[in-house]
Amino acid sequence: MFHATTIVAVKRGTKVAVAGDGQVTFGQNTIMKHTARKVRRLHNGQVLAGFAGSVADAFTLFEKFEGKLEEYHGNLMRAAVELAKAWRTDKYLRTLEAMLIVANQEHLLVLSGNGEVIEPDEGVTAIGSGGPYALAAARALTKHTNLSPKDITYEALNLAADICVYTNKNIVVEEI
């Protein structure tokens, strides 16, 4: 459904990292940008967020999510649930084509375009066209190594870029 990106996140204990590639693809066959930043710090650096999907839609969701974070004083779960409610019920928001991964030291969540809030069981998740590849790599590295979340997300995204034509190796990793 969503092309032109991969976002992967890993949470181990109180350490969490979110990584994204830099490729922006126009249509099915033209790379428009190699160095986009799809992972950001929010709420005074206490929350990480990454997006897959339409760039304009994702920026709208970032703005809405950041507003909810402020409204609920940094409570990630509450902000995510309230954004999901708005996403499901608001006529304009329902048309947005994007997904978000948001995380802090306590929670790692996926916010989908259907207004779902999903907290992965194993502290590992990925979205975007290269998401399945990055997810498989991150799960294996989490299970069989002692690498940090930062290193796991970097290596998982690097592997996804070897497989997915919509993902490049211009990797940005944010960690808290």
From Swiss-Prot:
Keyword terms, alphabetized: Allosteric enzyme, Cytoplasm, Hydrolase, Metal-binding, Protease, Sodium, Threonine protease
Protein's cellular compartments: Cytoplasm
Domain of life: Bacteria
E.C. code: 3.4.25.2
GO terms, molecular function: metal ion binding; threonine-type endopeptidase activity
InterPro entries referenced in this protein's UniProt entry, alphabetically: ATP-dep_Prtase_HsIV_su, Ntn_hydrolases_N, Proteasome_sua/b, Proteasome_suB-type
GO biological process: proteolysis involved in protein catabolic process
Name assigned to this protein: ATP-dependent protease subunit HslV
The species this protein was found in: Desulforamulus reducens (strain ATCC BAA-1160 / DSM 100696 / MI-1)
Lineage per the UniProt record: Bacteria, Bacillati, Bacillota, Clostridia, Eubacteriales
